[in-house]
Amino acid sequence: MQETNRTEISTVGEFGLIKRLTENIQLQNPESLYGVGDDAAVLDFGSQQTLVTTDLLMEGVHFDLVYTPLKHLGYKSAIVNFSDIYAMNGTPKQITVSLAVSKRFCIEDLEQFYEGLQLACQLHGVDIVGGDTTSSVTGLAISITCLGVANKDQVVYRNGAKETDLICVSGDLGAAYMGLQLLEREKAVFEGEQEINPDFTGKEYLLERQLKPEARKDIIDALHQEGIRPTSMMDISDGLSSELMHICTQSHTGCRIYEERIPIDYQTAVMAEELNMNVTTCALNGGEDYELLFTVPLSEHEKVASMKGVKVIGHITKPELGCALITRDGQEFELKAQGWNPLREK
């Protein structure tokens, strides 16, 4: 390869790379309604639109098999794809599964992976309809493509937020990141002392959020029951701050969120204190929560405020006001996209 005009991938990050590679792509087929730039592509085949999303998971980058059971990995691999479809206000229907496997894996290992994969599919009513397998010299690689459907007038994009809209999140944030920190800590201890027995007592919730996340179909169902169509929506995979800035950038808006309104579980707060970490920072930037971040018109306040598992954390503003966090003592800090980035230089 020529060394002239060489730009390191780490200087632009994951989303910068995607933009660079796809900014000149033009859709050629009328059925291709929306391509790169959201949680899933949208294909129009009549009264319903088809949603398509793909995730690639690499051993050593996205997961560590020292502490990740293969059954859990199979479950999580499916769930992260379903979450993207739900984030478009759609319903996942089918997946294809492709694996690159090194010689250290046996058939029984892959059966464990598929056991978790099938469990997730059964719970969400999704069919496994194809895929591919090949060999690998660098460990395990997983590529899953998920197809879903949504009615034409129900698809929700990232770019629809409007000034005065309420910013809402489901569940609680930061727990998955704390679970990862706990597992990494115990791994470091284990590697230094073979006789150690990890103690996870009282931290089971954090481990579950990291190893076995859930896609929030229940929230999508609740929104439908209330007759609410969000103006914008994403799932929180890279961190609240990063995802919120994606919504504001694509919607050409600003935002204000309030620290005291960010939902944080008790175990998350305890673990953050134990690790001498700021729990709000963990909630903003931790990632892998797979909760839903969405905006709704101010007129829907009463409905969303009464929804179980949903918290209103702020509002959308004019773009010139930027994106900011209001702390408990009233100070205003600029939000920065410091969430997880697989292409960042170590």
Residue ranges and their predicted role:
Residues 1-69, 88, 97, 345-346:
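Extreme N-terminal cap/leader segments of soluble proteins
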Residues 2-16, 20-26, 104-127, 137-142, ...:
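Glycine-/charge-enriched secondary-structure boundary and capping motifs
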Residues 34, 66-80, 104-115, 153:
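Glycine-rich anion/phosphate-binding loops
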Residues 42, 81, 89, 128, ...:
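Residue-level signal for inorganic ion chemistry
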Residues 57, 93-186, 315:
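Glycine-rich anion-binding loops of enzyme active sites
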Residues 70-94, 115-123, 222, 242-247:
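Small-aliphatic-rich amphipathic alpha-helix that forms the alpha element of a beta-alpha
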Residues 179-200:
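Short, compositionally biased
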Residues 197-244:
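Polyanion-binding loop/helix "lid" in catalytic or ligand-binding cores
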